Amino acid sequence: MWLTKLVLNPASRAARRDLANPYEMHRTLSKAVSRALEEGRERLLWRLEPARGLEPPVVLVQTLTEPDWSVLDEGYAQVFPPKPFHPALKPGQRLRFRLRANPAKRLAATGKRVALKTPAEKVAWLERRLEEGGFRLLEGERGPWVQILQDTFLEVRRKKDGEEAGKLLQVQAVLFEGRLEVVDPERALATLRRGVGPGKALGLGLLSVAP
């Protein structure tokens, strides 16, 4: 895997367009690994990091193949050199994590996906997803060692053929941060590669871990 940090230029018209629409952002970032995507060798994940005062927006991108960022428009972003990321996970290893995800449930009657409402429901969703993916949340004195740093709704327009404006969608985006433990290294690595939950094209699902 490869990790790239992009510092977007707010003066760039293309960057402003992408910041206003996650689908456009995903389309732009996909250009850096377009051939691998076409050949089915790629799984692009990305996350817009929390804003820090007046600092320019930062996007973290994870790819399975080495990206070519020369495809970006001139002045779009400051691109830090891609770094290879090959974590040697071990059972019992404890790590810090960050994840922006869409915690939701599917209604049995209609099959419609709806957002979870309470913090407890969202943390329980996270616990289940991590356990399915070879991790477990660490426990603190007051429960799972996790914080919800942001809880917002992304507003995006998804156009279908023949539509001019497209349908306005609201997608819940929750930023989790905390500590976890590796239970099954093989499943855990697969989880890092494929991401967690729905909404990958909206900048959701990238699970970042560090010692």
Curated annotation (Swiss-Prot):
For the keyword Disulfide bond, the answer is no
Altering E24A: what's the impact? 71% loss of cleavage activity
Q: Which domain of life is it from?
A: Bacteria
Documented effect of changing H26A: 99.8% loss of cleavage activity, binds RNA normally
MF (Gene Ontology): endonuclease activity; RNA binding
* Enzyme Commission number(s): 3.1.-.-
Keywords in UniProt for this one?
Antiviral defense, Endonuclease, Hydrolase, Nuclease, Plasmid, RNA-binding
NCBIfam families reported for this sequence: casE_Cse3 (TIGR01907)
Indicate what this protein is called per its UniProt record.
CRISPR-associated endoribonuclease Cse3
- Identify the gene encoding this protein: cse3
